[in-house]
């Protein structure tokens, strides 16, 4: 891994040390720049345009070289707005790709695609920077062990477990609890694994990014008093940014995560919201550069761009990056090239259900729709696998019986089916869990439930040991012992009322 230890010296003019070119043409966010013969920049080099516009306002635009056109001209894509630029303005070749600050100084801060802080909390220590373009780890460095990444969230660990160093797709509409689930995962990785998280906001609404930041401060994921104790770094390239910024912001977030993995040797969670917007931005840039479009108007390099990003997200012998990517499915068409290309890289999917959220069951993870390649007996063990399969079968049977119950009522079912329904309702409620980050809103203390405890709890429910307990005893509790204690309390309360 290449880390640049750079010390900025404002006294030395950049122009004295770097190649200088001039803007020859401007088409929206695309610039053509002419350089002297023999002084051409490399592909992906950063170019900086500094000067003043016609009103005397200062201009500072960073671009990235995308094409060498011949005749000593290059074509570059701007990372910020190009208003005020004119032909003939000086352009400085920085001699290397975009580099962003990495390390502990990034925690608790919000950055843009260039690694500049945008939260008005002052400058960031930029002595340690890293280029956003680099190769994926070599085969020899990879950790080939298949191990589960324990999240402490019952429904995830039991039914759709995450792989350490894997990639997880997070599917869910607005208002079903994506943000709260993301914040709980950030909180749990910090407490249970001593890890940190990086959140990449790629082409989503600025309002959502602001809401997430405020909620993180409120729940303690970001510590305003002592930023070093924060558990997350945020990188935003929202939907009002030029396509160049939206295309590269995912790489900026990934570069920060790689430093924590490779240098600090930590387990890292990388959130990308939304991976579809990364593809969408690549499609816009491809059209601006004049490339022939491929299927459904997407860029011909779609698979390559996705592979370049996804292959860097992996486990090495030093640490791991586990990535959770929100996936927008355009027009709910799973065969669209963007989601279809994403699915090829995913190890697990976590699907959030509006129906469960409406019932008040949080996290509203759909136990039947969520999947994982890790749920195999040789990886998770026979006990875990059998318990998960029995839970799914019980819930599936309950789902099939719901129409009959709605029309004829519960009394018309056979004894066996009534028992299945009762257990399924207990399981459904036991899959809910109080979150640490939601303590502020709910008043219930959060619970981290280990995998062994989770399996034990569901086995006991399936065995019929708790058939006599009321189903509300299983709602929003941690392990099974809390459910039995809650049942005792409920019984005492009902006796007192009588």
UniProtKB/Swiss-Prot annotation:
The keyword Cytoplasm does not apply. Keywords: ATP synthesis, ATP-binding, CF(1), Chloroplast, Hydrogen ion transport, Ion transport, Membrane, Nucleotide-binding, Phosphoprotein, Plastid, Thylakoid, Translocase, Transport. ATP binds at residues 172-179. It catalyses: ATP + H2O + 4 H(+)(in) = ADP + phosphate + 5 H(+)(out). Disulfide bonds: none annotated. Its EC number is 7.1.2.2. It is found in: Plastid, Chloroplast thylakoid membrane. The modification Phosphothreonine is found at residue 6. CDD domains: ATP-synt_F1_beta_C, ATP-synt_F1_beta_N, F1-ATPase_beta_CD. SMART domains: AAA. GO terms for molecular function: ATP binding; ATP hydrolysis activity; proton-transporting ATP synthase activity, rotational mechanism. GO terms for cellular component: chloroplast thylakoid membrane; mitochondrion; proton-transporting ATP synthase complex. Its main location: plastid. SUPFAM superfamilies: C-terminal domain of alpha and beta subunits of F1 ATP synthase, N-terminal domain of alpha and beta subunits of F1 ATP synthase, P-loop containing nucleoside triphosphate hydrolases. It is a peripheral membrane protein. The modification Phosphoserine is found at residue 13. One of its GO terms (biological process) is proton motive force-driven mitochondrial ATP synthesis. NCBIfam families: atpD. F-type ATPases have 2 components, CF(1) - the catalytic core - and CF(0) - the membrane proton channel. CF(1) has five subunits: alpha(3), beta(3), gamma(1), delta(1), epsilon(1). CF(0) has four main subunits: a(1), b(1), b'(1) and c(9-12). Produces ATP from ADP in the presence of a proton gradient across the membrane. The catalytic sites are hosted primarily by the beta subunits. Belongs to the ATPase alpha/beta chains family. This is ATP synthase subunit beta, chloroplastic. It comes from Nasturtium officinale (Watercress). The lineage of its organism: Eukaryota, Viridiplantae, Streptophyta, Embryophyta, Tracheophyta. The gene is atpB.
